[in-house]
Amino acid sequence: MSQIVTLKKNYQFRRVFRYGQSYATKYIVLFVLENSLNINRVGFSVGKKVGNSVTRNRVKRLLREVYRLNNPNMMQGYDLILLARFRADELDYHKCQREFIRLTKKSKLLQKNVI
């Protein structure tokens, strides 16, 4: 099982929000900022407007799993933030997967030989 390297500190999130490029779909916003490492670091954020705490945690688990499965197919060396939008509580696994693939294609993070 692959380990996900996460953004944990507030300053890390602020840097990506401030200087990163954003790509959005109906349910998810992806913020991307190049880092000087050869790995991707990712942060997950679900605001309080998305359901109750159980729903927010479910959405975070969905995002984390979709990222974990697709990270090997992505370009490395980026800090990413996956931000769930207001209607993200409507997501199921397959819809979340489609949205994530759409965002990675839009941001050119998906490697060319995949999908």
Swiss-Prot record:
One of its GO terms (biological process) is tRNA 5'-leader removal. Its EC number is 3.1.26.5. Pfam families: Ribonuclease_P (PF00825). InterPro entries: Ribosomal_Su5_D2-typ_SF (IPR020568), Ribsml_uS5_D2-typ_fold_subgr (IPR014721), RNase_P (IPR000100). It catalyses: Endonucleolytic cleavage of RNA, removing 5'-extranucleotides from tRNA precursor. One of its GO terms (molecular function) is tRNA binding. SUPFAM superfamilies: Ribosomal protein S5 domain 2-like (SSF54211). This is Ribonuclease P protein component. It comes from Natranaerobius thermophilus (strain ATCC BAA-1301 / DSM 18059 / JW/NM-WN-LF). The gene is rnpA.
